[in-house]
Structure formats: structure tokens, C-alpha cells
């Protein structure tokens, strides 16, 4: 996890045999709290990579194991079940796995594996009103992890989501006898947003992911999303008719 290595300049990875390996930071992504390190002398030890579980293979009730170094005690494995999938803890596009496997300081960034030893997620955080483990922990699922990690390894960062090149003109309109704020889409020239105007001459955004439209709301949704994620726009056309579209984002 990115929060684990923040502020650190030199990195050392310790194997379960107690061997220390120097490592370099390849890149990171703040949205997912993910960082990628690469050990510099991996060939000397013939290290094996963990097998990723198939995407969408984890179900509620499945047995899972969290591996980490809680409180610096050393390699520790705790067990639990998948309590829920697609949890939103601030960013709905991360769709975190919720488990009841014990997670404490030192577990962050550790593997969450299934009974076959396959990686299903990376432990990232807990929910607690006391600061201590309360039976609710979260992990970034392998579905998102593999996509984000691949981009970090290739580009040094994970690309941002985009709806294309366009501007928003803030206006107020009267709809259903109510005065509402609306973001009119103007100066559109490319990207997924352009497809909307194949059947419409003028469009105003009333809602973004079912929440009232504002420039800040649209910015935050795009900031949290990843390329390929869908954003739901509720639109009003020039005839006064409402439309709802799920638009798959592009990358920038």
C-alpha cells in the first residue's frame, strides 16, 4: 500500500527466510492506495510469483486468509470469510472485498488468498470506531489490482478516466416546475461524450451517478474512476425529455 511507504526513500524487502533484498519504487496510484516495488537482485533467489485468482471468482462466504506482519511480530496468517463484495468506503469504483479476517497495523499491503493459495486481493484498511480490529477489514480485489498494477508497471502510474474533450456551461433551467442547476455540455470534440450527440442536438447534465450535478461532483467522479469504468449521466435534451446513459470512460 502507498500509505505504508509514504516518506520512505530507501526500500528493503525481507523474504520469509530472513533475506533482505534492495528494492526500487516503480510507481503508485493514490486512488487505490497501491504502490509497486521491484527487488533489484531477484534472480539470485529464483523468486516465484503468486498466482492470481480468476476475476469475479470470489463469493460471499468463501474462506480467505490474510498474510501480514501485524505490529511487527513477524509473518502472520489470519483466516476469515468474505463478508461482502463491492463495498464502497469512499470510492465506489474500487469495489472492495469485506472480510472478517483479523487485520491490524502491519497487515496493510499483505496478500489476501483463497484456499488454493491464489491471490484474491490486497489488504488495505479496516473499519473501526476504536482504532482496533472490530471484525471488518477490506481488500482491493484482484480484478482492480491486476489492471492498476499493470499500468503502474508499464507507465509508472495508473491512467485517469476521461469522458472526452468538452466544456460545461452552468445554467439554471425550469423542469417540472422546479428551478434546477444544469451543466450544459458545450465545445465537445472527442471521446465517449461525443457519441451522445449522434442523436441529440443539445444536452444538459442533471445528475452524475444519481447525485445532483455540479462541477465538483463531476470532477470527483472522474478523479475516482478508472479507464473502462462506467459513469451514469442523467441528461435533459432540448425537447425537455430526460435520458439516462451509462457511459464507459476512456483514458488520458
Question: Which residues are covered by each model-predicted region?
Answer:
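Serine-dependent protease modules
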Residues: 1-174, 216-219, 223-226, 238-239, ...
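Conserved PDZ fold ligand-binding element
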Residues: 1-2, 185, 193-217
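Short loop/turn microsegments at loop-to-beta-strand junctions
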Residues: 9, 107-110, 184-185, 192-194, ...
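A short glycine-leucine-enriched loop at secondary-structure breakpoints
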Residues: 54, 111, 176-179, 190-204, ...
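Generic structural signal for well-ordered beta-strand positions
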Residues: 120-121, 206, 243
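Edge beta-strands of extracellular beta-sandwich domains
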Residues: 244-248
Amino acid at each position: 500500500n502507498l500509505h505504508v511507504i509514504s516518506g520512505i526513500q530507501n526500500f528493503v524487502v525481507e523474504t520469509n527466510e530472513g533475506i533482505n533484498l534492495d528494492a526500487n519504487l516503480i510507481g503508485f496510484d493514490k486512488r487505490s492506495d497501491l504502490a509497486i516495488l521491484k527487488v533489484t537482485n531477484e534472480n539470485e533467489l529464483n523468486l516465484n510469483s503468486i498466482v492470481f485468482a480468476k476475476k469475479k471468482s470470489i463469493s460471499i462466504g468463501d474462506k480467505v486468509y490474510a498474510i501480514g506482519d501485524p505490529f511487527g511480530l513477524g509473518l502472520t496468517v489470519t483466516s476469515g470469510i468474505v463478508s461482502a463484495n463491492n463495498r464502497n468506503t469512499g470510492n465506489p469504483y474500487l469495489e472492495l472485498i469485506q472480510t472478517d479476517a483479523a487485520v491490524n497495523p502491519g497487515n496493510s499491503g499483505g496478500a489476501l488468498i483463497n484456499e488454493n493459495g491464489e491471490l484474491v486481493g490486497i489488504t488495505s484498511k479496516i473499519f473501526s470506531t476504536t482504532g482496533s480490529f472490530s471484525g471488518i477489514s477490506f481488500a482491493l480485489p484482484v480484478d482492480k489490482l491486476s489492471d492498476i498494477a499493470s499500468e503502474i508497471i508499464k507507465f509508472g502510474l495508473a491512467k485517469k478516466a476521461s469522458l472526452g474533450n468538452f466544456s460545461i456551461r452552468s445554467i439554471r433551467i425550469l423542469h417540472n416546475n422546479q428551478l434546477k442547476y444544469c451543466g450544459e455540455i458545450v465545445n465537445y470534440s472527442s471521446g465517449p461524450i461525443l457519441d451522445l450527440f449522434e442523436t441529440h442536438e443539445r444536452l444538459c447534465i442533471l445528475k452524475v451517478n444519481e447525485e445532483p450535478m455540479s462541477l465538483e461532483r463531476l470532477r470527483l467522479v472522474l478523479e475516482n474512476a478508472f479507464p473502462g469504468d462506467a459513469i451514469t449521466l442523467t441528461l435533459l435534451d432540448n425537447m425537455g425529455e430526460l435520458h439516462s446513459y451509462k457511459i464507459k470512460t476512456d483514458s488520458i
